[in-house]
Curated annotation (Swiss-Prot):
The gene is dync2li1. It comes from Danio rerio (Zebrafish). Residues 1-35, 307-358 are annotated as: Disordered. Residues 24-33 have a biased composition (Acidic residues). GO terms for molecular function: dynein heavy chain binding. Residues 307-320, 333-349 have a biased composition (Basic and acidic residues). One of its GO terms (cellular component) is microtubule. SUPFAM superfamilies: P-loop containing nucleoside triphosphate hydrolases. This is Cytoplasmic dynein 2 light intermediate chain 1. InterPro entries: DYNC2LI1, Dynein_light_int_chain, P-loop_NTPase. Belongs to the dynein light intermediate chain family.
Length: 358
């Protein structure tokens, strides 16, 4: 005799609510868009000359030589889910110049795409002294822009039919949910140039690894280390970016060994697994930290003192950059520069020739 379910309609509804509460916004998005083409935006930013363009080209499987990104560049990728199906589109933005051009975040982060937006932060592991400032400055600028856009939408009463709630809400079982401050949109932190990083002193590697694990967990982000010289790590990074760009299945492999490239999907780590900051060179008791985030920052910058790079001054003059050469325009510009120099010399001579009476 078949078993008859004793669940009432109320029991079934309650179970459905519990099921939905346990899912992340990204998982809900994947279910909602399973049968419809999507358009998502992925915003790449990070360390100057940190390998963002290389990672982006590898993701798009383009056999091109990476060129320095002058300011802000746009491209796109498409992916078919099956035979004779509309292709999903990923709008891909890349911010160049490190922290010097952070004001440009307002261009790729708009009311039209904020509900479909995710961020990839690329940090150069070979330059740990600039790592914290780069992370804090760029994520701060991006967060402020997202919050500004969301506030404007709420003020005008507009509603966007998006896949994810913004700011996103972590499910109730997310590790340490009450102790972290999740980034308002999905975030992937990529540690680049692992091939150089792996030659660092083991204690310094441990400090960097634990700190980035804490930061990724604090922001509710995924974390992966990669190297352009390792196809294995580049393939893993593609999987993480694919999930953001096209809603593919979340990578499940986890690696927390500091001697190997880290790979930690969001929600797979916890404060208890990460442990306290590495303090072999620091007496934590002497540090006056306001909160755990501030403590990790103080410990990290004791080991890797902040170096002011003045990136704004380091930016190359695009007029002299061969990447943007225009022979005809450049020759006219050179002629005008010569005329200006000659005019300045003549004016200087005329002032010197003046006999000014006392």
């Amino acid at each position: 005799m078949p078993k008859v379910s004793s669940d009432t309609l109320w029991d079934i509804a309650a179970a459905e609510v519990r099921s939905r509460e346990s899912r992340t916004d990204e998982e809900e998005a994947e279910e909602e868009d399973a049968h419809f083409p999507s358009q998502r935006t992925v915003f790449f930013m990070g360390s100057k000359a940190g390998g963002k363009t290389t990672i982006l080209l590898r993701f798009l499987e383009r056999d091109e030589t990476a060129k320095p990104t002058l300011a802000l560049e746009y491209t796109f990728g498409r992916r078919a889910r099956g035979h004779n199906t509309p292709k999903d589109i990923a709008h891909l933005w890349e911010l160049g110049g490190g922290i010097s051009l952070s004001d440009l975040v307002q261009i790729p982060i708009t009311a039209d795409n904020v509900s479909f937006l995710s961020v990839v932060l690329v940090l150069d592991l070979s330059k740990p002294n600039a790592l914290w400032e780069t992370m804090e400055s760029l994520l701060g600028s991006a967060r402020n822009q997202v919050e500004k856009v969301c506030a404007a939408l709420q003020k005008t009463g507009e509603s966007r039919s998006g896949k994810q709630r913004v700011p996103r809400v972590l499910h109730k079982d997310y590790p340490d949910r009450e102790l972290i401050s999740p980034f308002p949109v999905p975030l992937l932190i990529v540690g680049s140039k692992f091939d150089i990083f792996q030659d660092f002193d083991s204690e310094k590697r441990k400090v960097i690894c634990k700190t980035l694990r804490f930061l990724a967990h604090f922001y509710g982000a995924s974390l992966i280390f990669t190297s352009s010289k390792s196809e294995t790590t580049m393939s893993k990074s593609r999987s993480f970016i694919n999930q953001l760009a096209f809603g593919t299945e979340r990578p499940k492999s986890i690696s927390t060994d500091p001697s190997k490239p880290l790979a930690i999907p969001a929600g797979s780590d916890s404060l208890s697994q990460i442990g306290p900051p590495v303090a072999t060179e620091v007496d934590i008791g002497t540090l006056h930290a306001k909160n755990p985030f501030d403590l990790w920052k103080k410990v990290f910058e004791k080991v890797f003192p902040h170096e002011s790079t003045r990136e704004r001054k380091e930016l190359k003059d695009p007029v002299k950059d061969p990447q943007f050469s225009e022979p005809l325009i450049d020759s006219i510009r050179a002629q005008k520069d010569q005329e200006l120099d000659q005019y300045k010399r003549e004016q200087a001579k005329s002032w010197k020739s003046l006999a000014l009476d006392p």
